[in-house]
A protein has these predicted regions:
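Conserved NTP-binding catalytic cores of kinases and kinase-like/nucleotidyltransferase enzymes
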Residues: 1-89, 211-212, 327
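An alpha-helical support segment within catalytic cores of ATP-dependent transferases
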Residues: 9-13, 147-148, 159-201, 211-214
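Active-site acidic catalytic loop and adjacent metal/ATP-binding pocket
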Residues: 31-42, 46-48, 185-232
Length: 327
């Protein structure tokens, strides 16, 4: 791999005096990207191979080159407004990524400056309130960014597509049909014709790095940047930042969720209708996401395993949907 990376880095550096591939990151991820921590000429970088067939999930299609260019443009925009987004490096031709063919796959190679920091995944009221302030700052700045490349698609459209995928396999399973009916109810409750689309990036805890002073030091995600309804995006963040036992846990805390809204100063932008939507948006974000759909399709032929799986996500949905009604 070192030789392959060195061949690509010739497009970025006039001279390469030293190169070390220090670590392969996020192995065996669903998106088939390759990600390495490297050191070139004594400086650390993130070397990312983004698969040309990459998709966030089947509901939203593949990530095109045009979208990737626009995503990088948005990161520059945020950096211009003093948001600590990871710095992307253009190649010597001035392009934001380099096209690479390897092992019968096509990739977009993106080189970024490495950021040292800590992921905080066990959320506390103080940390979450601090990040709520940061998220509000980012969203307010993002309101002025306009794009003709990104599509304005509601998360609800994605959930409907997931429902269609499940319904095609659910005819013989009573428990799954009941679950689908519950999901449809939440989609209906979360619907509004008054969407406020702003460009957002995925600010989940694994994409945010903190410094020793408990301040946000860096944001590293960029390939999920797109238009998102502001309230739908806010519900997505509350799902993540209400977790007190780590990102693999379904344990959430209403006090922590409320602390996020306090930091975000949500009271001065949310309408009564937005608060009504939150309960169902939270349910959908945790209990009808791509991980749920993928697992459901994988166990659908095993009745017992399917029932146990649905119960886990049914309980999760109940916890999420009651987060803000318990405060």
């Amino acid at each position: 791999m070192k030789h392959k990376i060195k061949d690509i880095l010739i497009n970025y550096f006039k001279e390469i005096h030293s190169l070390a591939v220090e670590e392969e990151l996020y192995k065996d991820r669903w998106n088939t990207d390759l990600h390495y921590k490297i050191m070139v000429n004594g400086k650390r970088y993130s070397a990312r191979f983004i698969n040309s067939k990459r998709t966030i999930n089947p509901a939203f299609g593949a990530l095109s080159n045009e979208q990737l260019i626009e995503q990088v443009r948005f990161t520059y925009y945020l950096r211009e407004h003093e948001i600590p987004f990871m710095q992307r490096n253009k190649n010597r031709a001035g392009e934001p990524f380099t096209l690479v063919a390897w092992n019968d796959e096509q990739y977009r190679f993106v080189l970024s400056n490495w950021i040292e920091g800590e992921h905080i995944t066990h959320c506390t009221e103080n940390i979450v309130e601090a990040f709520g302030k940061e998220a509000r700052k980012i969203h307010d700045i993002s309101c002025a960014f306009q794009s003709s490349i990104f599509q304005k698609i509601s998360h609800l459209d994605g959930y409907v597509e997931f429902i269609n995928m499940l319904e095609s396999r659910a005819s013989a399973c009573k428990e799954l049909r009941e679950y689908i009916d519950l999901a449809k109810y939440h989609i209906e409750c979360a619907y509004t014709s008054e969407l406020e689309f702003i460009v957002q990036t995925d600010l989940n805890p694994l994409n945010v790095l903190w410094g020793s002073s408990q301040k946000v030091k860096g944001i590293v995600d960029f390939e999920s940047i797109s238009y998102v309804d502001r309230i739908e995006g806010l519900a997505f963040l509350i799902k993540w930042y209400s977790r007190t036992e780590g990102v693999q846990s379904h344990e959430v805390c209403s006090k922590v969720a409320s602390s996020f809204l306090v930091g975000y100063k949500a009271h001065n932008i949310l309408t009564p209708n937005d608060y009504k939507r939150f309960s169902s948006l939270l349910w959908l974000s945790g209990s009808l996401n791509w991980n749920f759909v993928k697992k459901t399709l994988g166990v659908i032929s095993d009745e017992r395993e399917l029932e146990e799986h649905l119960e886990v996500y049914r309980v999760r949905g109940e916890r999420l949907s009651s987060l803000l009604t318990c405060t």
